[in-house]
Amino acid sequence: TTSKYGMKKPGSWGTQQDIVLMALDGEAWDNFLMTEEEAGLAEEAEKVEKEKESKDNNGKDSKKKDKKKGKADSEKKESSKKNDLEFADGRYRQIRLTDVSTLMGDYWLNKKGDKLYYTAVDPTGEMTLYMEDLKKNETSPVMSGVQAMEADAAGDNLFLITRGGGLTKMNLASGTKEPVAFEADYDRKPSAEREYIYSHMLRQVNDKFYDVNLHGVDWEYYGDHYRQFLPHIGNDRDFADLLSEILGELNASHTGAKCFAGDAELEVADLGAYFDDSSDGAGLKVSSVMPRGPLSRRNANVAPGDIILAIDGKEIVKGADYSSMLEGKAGRPVSLRIRKADGKEVTSKVKPITPGRLRQLAYERWVENNERVVDSVSGGKIGYVHVKGMDGDSFRTIYERILGKYRNCDAIVVDTRYNGGGWLHNDLAILLSGKEYVNFSPRGQFIGHEPFSQWTKPSVMLVCEGNYSDAHGSPYTYQTLGIGDIVGAPIPGTMTAVWWENQINPMITFGIPQVTSLDLNGRPLENQQLNPDLIIYN
């Protein structure tokens, strides 16, 4: 596959791919490029030639046949010499097989080389099996929900792993599909499973940790020491804690273990407001309403100072936990009885939101407040953006703001505080390090300059102790390249790439920091604190 033709996400977060064929034989290349009609005529001519040879051979005696066989063997040897792979011109014998770039999975070309089967993400986000007729240049979906595929040895059937782990056999000649029934029973012994995972973790760290000396830790000693607690552990959460304890002895970032618990049956929804905990009396006194939240809508009729007395007819008792009244209510109409600040009681219908949506709204409010502060103190001359994560979505957001709304500002504040990382340092550096070299001016009117897709004016980067991973790497890059000043609190050194490995128990995963970054002096950035140019704790 190649990413030559497809779209690329910022920060190496994935690219669309295509399947490309390279012919290492000139004759095979010519045959592949034949049209459907030309291929049919060639097959017919080959069939006629074989029939003619068969008739000729049947009319000769065995002696002549032996001579013929010897001659055929000689010709076969000559033919094998002719079929040596031709690498020299390989790059000129390449062709893009797929007609649309997408996120690719498995792929397989049939024996005749005229049909390509591949799995790719469809417009709805579903992994789908496609078949492309290379002679007719037509692509059609075959089956949705296909996670992986493999052809049998003869190339007559495809075996498909479908959504949910099912197995399907598809005959390529007829196109028929039939489920493959199978059983894979096993006896699970959780204690033995944990023993295995623990030993596996010890080996993996010893083999893959970025520092061959394991930060000077006596790993064998700690492995024996913590093993004594295994017999006393009876659940995944405690086991993950044990793994985290021993991995913590490495004094490294990007490690520890996680236990993925099942989702709660009934998630507690939220009304999207902050309440006055010091308020006397029953109900919830609203201190502020979250913008774009359920209570901010005009028909909700809720304002700071109002008191929510009941939810779906259930009274809110002073000091009591009201969360049970909102269990499973996200996105569903809820009735609120409200006492307005003037003493009048009203009833409103609202749709509570999920905790995740509440966090997003709170984040947006924080960013908007920061924007207002910077705009106010600078008189509109300085812009402000916050990089939420070192990922493609965050990059697109700040790219639009920096080169859109703030294009005419004199400077930009790039806030990376509380960023959990990702992989975006080079994209940020390119965006913020533009050097203006030409202006465009028809008839004396300025209309723009190059580079148009980079910020060419001053910038400053805000950081804090909460910057992690590539949110350490990005300020390091920014500071090392001299793009601008770093302002804020020192950042712990955590610019290291991690491999989170899922275990045979799918509820358990642990991390191994495999690749650290070295500064220009060859020192690991792991555990190397970054000091801002101007230290301000906030």
Regions picked out by a protein language model, each given a short descriptive name:
Residues 1, 9, 101-119, 141-161, ...:
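Conserved beta-propeller blade repeats
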Residues 69-90:
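Blade/loop signatures of beta-propeller domains
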Residues 173-245, 249-250, 256, 280-284:
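Terminal targeting/pro-maturation regions of precursor/exported proteins
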Residues 231-281, 343-369:
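Extended, small/polar residue-biased N-terminal targeting/export presequences
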Residues 24-49, 84-102, 133-147, 174-190:
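Multi-bladed beta-propeller domains
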Residues 266-319, 392, 515-516:
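PDZ/PDZ-like domain segments forming the peptide/carboxylate-binding groove
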Residues 208, 287, 311-315, 319-508:
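Cleft-lining beta-strand/loop regions that shape enzyme active-site pockets
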Residues 1-73, 120-128, 162-168, 187-190:
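A flexible loop/linker signature enriched in serine peptidases of the S9 family
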